[in-house]
Curated annotation (Swiss-Prot):
This is Aspartyl/glutamyl-tRNA(Asn/Gln) amidotransferase subunit C. It catalyses: L-glutamyl-tRNA(Gln) + L-glutamine + ATP + H2O = L-glutaminyl-tRNA(Gln) + L-glutamate + ADP + phosphate + H(+); L-aspartyl-tRNA(Asn) + L-glutamine + ATP + H2O = L-asparaginyl-tRNA(Asn) + L-glutamate + ADP + phosphate + 2 H(+). The gene is gatC. Residues 76-98 are annotated as: Disordered. The lineage of its organism: Bacteria, Bacillati, Actinomycetota, Actinomycetes, Micrococcales. InterPro entries: Asp/Glu-ADT_sf_sub_c (IPR036113), GatC (IPR003837). Transmembrane segments: none annotated. Its EC number is 6.3.5.-. Heterotrimer of A, B and C subunits.
Length: 98
């Protein structure tokens, strides 16, 4: 893979319509070179015998049994509400009606 230089960064910035100063172009060329080197290192280590994975460790959900616990009655729930109507919480309107 070819090295990324300042001219490559300037070209990419132009294609992406990103204005970059001279110092930003120089700094970005160095940062992208480090990234390319890192990708090269990983590419050299990963062989054809390594299976493709989406995550480095297996994913598994930890689930608990869905059991019914203590349930409050509707009256108990609404007893702490500042206002209730027809068995529901009553809140101030926030949208205008047409």
């Amino acid at each position: 893979m070819a090295e990324i230089n300042r001219d490559d960064v300037a070209h990419l910035a132009q294609l992406a319509h990103i204005d970059m100063s001279e110092s930003e172009l120089d700094r970005m060329a160095g940062e992208l070179a480090v990234i390319v080197d890192s990708v090269k290192s990983v590419s050299e280590i990963a062989g054809d015998d390594a299976p493709a994975t989406s995550h480095p460790i297996p994913l598994s959900n930890v689930l608990r049994e869905d059991t019914v616990g203590h349930v409050l009655s509707q009256e108990q729930v609404l007893s702490g509400a500042p206002d209730a109507e027809d068995g529901r919480f009553k809140v101030p309107a926030i949208l205008e009606e047409d």
